[in-house]
Amino acid sequence: MPMFVVNTNVPRASVPDGLLSELTQQLAQATGKPAQYIAVHVVPDQLMTFGGSSEPCALCSLHSIGKIGGAQNRSYSKLLCGLLTERLRISPDRIYINFCDMNAANVGWNGSTFA
């Protein structure tokens, strides 16, 4: 159930077609979880600053049941910062990513939970 959310001040017109699909496929590969369970939400056009500057920036979160922790998070950070830098032209030092390990009983899906 990985869920990746990107809040950014990058305008919608600058979000390339295929970005969500690319993020889905890359996260499926990185987490080892099926793409059919991965949700990606990119929220452009946000009023945001980072370090007092309104240059392109992103505040992100990656939620997952398991597959979250030290070395994995560093790998995800490298992957996701790289994609956001390449596709949205956001400098990696203007991206924060929060990693959240979810309890399966606290994640609902398809009328039940993952527990």
Curated annotation (Swiss-Prot):
<feature type="modified residue" description="N6-acetyllysine; alternate">
    <location>
        <position position="78"/>
    </location>
</feature>
<feature type="modified residue" description="N6-succinyllysine; alternate">
    <location>
        <position position="78"/>
    </location>
</feature>
<dbReference type="GO" id="GO:0031666">
    <property type="term" value="P:positive regulation of lipopolysaccharide-mediated signaling pathway"/>
</dbReference>
<dbReference type="GO" id="GO:0042802">
    <property type="term" value="F:identical protein binding"/>
</dbReference>
<comment type="similarity">
    <text>Belongs to the MIF family.</text>
</comment>
<dbReference type="GO" id="GO:0010629">
    <property type="term" value="P:negative regulation of gene expression"/>
</dbReference>
<keyword id="KW-0964">Secreted</keyword>
<dbReference type="GO" id="GO:0061078">
    <property type="term" value="P:positive regulation of prostaglandin secretion involved in immune response"/>
</dbReference>
<dbReference type="GO" id="GO:0010760">
    <property type="term" value="P:negative regulation of macrophage chemotaxis"/>
</dbReference>
<protein>
    <recommendedName>
        <fullName>Macrophage migration inhibitory factor</fullName>
        <ecNumber>5.3.2.1</ecNumber>
        <ecNumber>5.3.3.12</ecNumber>
    </recommendedName>
</protein>
<feature type="binding site">
    <location>
        <position position="65"/>
    </location>
    <ligand>
        <name>substrate</name>
    </ligand>
</feature>
<dbReference type="InterPro" id="IPR019829">
    <property type="entry name" value="Macrophage_inhib_fac_CS"/>
</dbReference>
<dbReference type="GO" id="GO:2000343">
    <property type="term" value="P:positive regulation of chemokine (C-X-C motif) ligand 2 production"/>
</dbReference>
<comment type="subunit">
    <text>Homotrimer. Interacts with CXCR2 extracellular domain. Interacts with the CD74 extracellular domain, USO1, COPS5 and BNIPL.</text>
</comment>
<dbReference type="GO" id="GO:0004167">
    <property type="term" value="F:dopachrome isomerase activity"/>
</dbReference>
<dbReference type="GO" id="GO:0005829">
    <property type="term" value="C:cytosol"/>
</dbReference>
<dbReference type="GO" id="GO:0001516">
    <property type="term" value="P:prostaglandin biosynthetic process"/>
</dbReference>
<dbReference type="InterPro" id="IPR014347">
    <property type="entry name" value="Tautomerase/MIF_sf"/>
</dbReference>
<feature type="binding site">
    <location>
        <position position="33"/>
    </location>
    <ligand>
        <name>substrate</name>
    </ligand>
</feature>
<dbReference type="GO" id="GO:2000773">
    <property type="term" value="P:negative regulation of cellular senescence"/>
</dbReference>
<dbReference type="GO" id="GO:0042056">
    <property type="term" value="F:chemoattractant activity"/>
</dbReference>
<dbReference type="GO" id="GO:0005615">
    <property type="term" value="C:extracellular space"/>
</dbReference>
<dbReference type="Pfam" id="PF01187">
    <property type="entry name" value="MIF"/>
</dbReference>
<dbReference type="GO" id="GO:0007166">
    <property type="term" value="P:cell surface receptor signaling pathway"/>
</dbReference>
<keyword id="KW-0202">Cytokine</keyword>
<dbReference type="GO" id="GO:0005126">
    <property type="term" value="F:cytokine receptor binding"/>
</dbReference>
<keyword id="KW-0391">Immunity</keyword>
<dbReference type="GO" id="GO:0061081">
    <property type="term" value="P:positive regulation of myeloid leukocyte cytokine production involved in immune response"/>
</dbReference>
<comment type="function">
    <text>Pro-inflammatory cytokine involved in the innate immune response to bacterial pathogens. The expression of MIF at sites of inflammation suggests a role as mediator in regulating the function of macrophages in host defense. Counteracts the anti-inflammatory activity of glucocorticoids. Has phenylpyruvate tautomerase and dopachrome tautomerase activity (in vitro), but the physiological substrate is not known. It is not clear whether the tautomerase activity has any physiological relevance, and whether it is important for cytokine activity.</text>
</comment>
<keyword id="KW-0963">Cytoplasm</keyword>
<dbReference type="GO" id="GO:0002906">
    <property type="term" value="P:negative regulation of mature B cell apoptotic process"/>
</dbReference>
<dbReference type="GO" id="GO:0006954">
    <property type="term" value="P:inflammatory response"/>
</dbReference>
<dbReference type="GO" id="GO:0141163">
    <property type="term" value="P:positive regulation of cAMP/PKA signal transduction"/>
</dbReference>
<keyword id="KW-0413">Isomerase</keyword>
<feature type="binding site">
    <location>
        <position position="98"/>
    </location>
    <ligand>
        <name>substrate</name>
    </ligand>
</feature>
<dbReference type="GO" id="GO:0043518">
    <property type="term" value="P:negative regulation of DNA damage response, signal transduction by p53 class mediator"/>
</dbReference>
<dbReference type="GO" id="GO:0048146">
    <property type="term" value="P:positive regulation of fibroblast proliferation"/>
</dbReference>
<dbReference type="GO" id="GO:0051248">
    <property type="term" value="P:negative regulation of protein metabolic process"/>
</dbReference>
<keyword id="KW-0399">Innate immunity</keyword>
<dbReference type="GO" id="GO:0005654">
    <property type="term" value="C:nucleoplasm"/>
</dbReference>
<dbReference type="InterPro" id="IPR001398">
    <property type="entry name" value="Macrophage_inhib_fac"/>
</dbReference>
<feature type="active site" description="Proton acceptor; via imino nitrogen">
    <location>
        <position position="2"/>
    </location>
</feature>
